[in-house]
Amino acid sequence: MAGAESPTECQAELEPVVSLVDVLEEDEELENEACAVLGGSDSEKCSYSQGSVGRQALYACSTCTPEGEEPAGICLACSYECHGSHKLFELYTKRNFRCDCGNSKFKNLECKLFPDKSKVNSCNKYNDNFFGLYCVCKRPYPDPEDEVPDEMIQCVVCEDWFHGRHLGAIPPESGDFQEMVCQACMRRCSFLWAYAAQLAVTRISAEDDGLLPNATGMGDEDVSKPENGAPQDNGLKEDAPEHGRDSVNEVKAEQKNEPCSSSSSESDLQTVFKKENIKTEPQSSCRLQELQAKQFVKKDAATYWPLNWRSKLCTCQDCMKMYGELDVLFLTDECDTVLAYENKGKNDQATDRRDPLMDTLSSMNRVQQVELICEYNDLKTELKDYLKRFADEGTVVKREDIQQFFEEFQSKKRRRVDGLQYYCS
């Protein structure tokens, strides 16, 4: 029929057009993500000798420790060397963990990189992630039965991963938040609600009209009000003793994409606190107590926190004691954040990554450098023009096309060299 489009034309219209630039940009983005997650971890040496590492990339081996067995985690190097052909669960990063590879939890495997390990690592913490299950729904990721596109977000406290729709509070549309604290951890660390009224990206205030739906469809809220201007404990007695005696300097250096020079473990923070190596100010008010004196709302929902929110937490002696009792002293450590870990990885990779072109240039004299740069620019220009023809025509670039390009390029180069005439003065 006249005017009808052929099946090929229809298919061409339906298929998305991806340029070479798009492919290169996507490849670079994936490489940067990999560097961020893996760059801060050693890919050749087992991390066991470092003790409980402040933060590192971790994996769980479903082949060696399937569901029903004791959970175990392995470091990046062991995932390559000892479990290369096994089914692994990628756990992203976790804090204060010591590699389990080859210990008593692995019945038929000895670690190739560090075989002399203790039977168990009693300080390690495990959850359902080590069996490939995540969120309150306890489902795998990716979930073949879940057709709803949803982002998985990691809780900064328990380090479990959650679907955005199961957090009781919708993630900010802009994605402009650094960390999230899940519903269960907000219940356990209820002191954070006083900070949430001032710091959370989606602020929780007494003037909020609606209730945010939580994972079970409920939206409970508790408005805490001061009585006669006096500070209230707001149900925080179970979290910690009364606050507000000696306080420490709360002003911390803001983290602006610079990595922390070292990772402090939870045990390090405990040691610092126990030895009272904290500079105290003269008696002044506790920041948490000041916030609790104001009206704020507690909800059964997750909270989302901005960059550097941890530096705003009170670090007086009573608050530090409370953090220790709740096992969240890491919240006072800016180096504990995933962002700090990722930035360290990126910087380490940038330092280690050598540019072969720059290495070649540095080994040449000035004349050779100029000639090489000119040749490089010629190649770049001609290759761009050559590929543009395929883009304009909508045709696929084949291996033979690239071979033909370089043959023609070399031929042109030989003609230019052969055509040069040298004169002696």
Swiss-Prot record:
This is Putative E3 ubiquitin-protein ligase UBR7. Its EC number is 2.3.2.27. A zinc finger (UBR-type) spans 44-116. The keyword Metal-binding applies. It comes from Mus musculus. A zinc finger (PHD-type) spans 132-188. One of its GO terms (biological process) is protein ubiquitination. GO terms for molecular function: ubiquitin protein ligase activity; zinc ion binding. Pathway: Protein modification; protein ubiquitination. E3 ubiquitin-protein ligase which is a component of the N-end rule pathway. Recognizes and binds to proteins bearing specific N-terminal residues that are destabilizing according to the N-end rule, leading to their ubiquitination and subsequent degradation. PROSITE patterns: ZF_UBR (PS51157). It is an enzyme of class 2 (transferase). Residues 212-269 are annotated as: Disordered. Expressed in testis and sperm (at protein level). Keywords: Isopeptide bond, Metal-binding, Phosphoprotein, Transferase, Ubl conjugation, Ubl conjugation pathway, Zinc, Zinc-finger. Residues 235-257 have a biased composition (Basic and acidic residues). There is a cross-link at residues 225, 252, 274, 398 (Glycyl lysine isopeptide (Lys-Gly) (interchain with G-Cter in SUMO2)). PANTHER family: E3 UBIQUITIN-PROTEIN LIGASE UBR7, E3 UBIQUITIN-PROTEIN LIGASE UBR7-RELATED. The modification Phosphoserine is found at residue 264. It comes from the Eukaryota. It catalyses: S-ubiquitinyl-[E2 ubiquitin-conjugating enzyme]-L-cysteine + [acceptor protein]-L-lysine = [E2 ubiquitin-conjugating enzyme]-L-cysteine + N(6)-ubiquitinyl-[acceptor protein]-L-lysine. SUPFAM superfamilies: FYVE/PHD zinc finger.
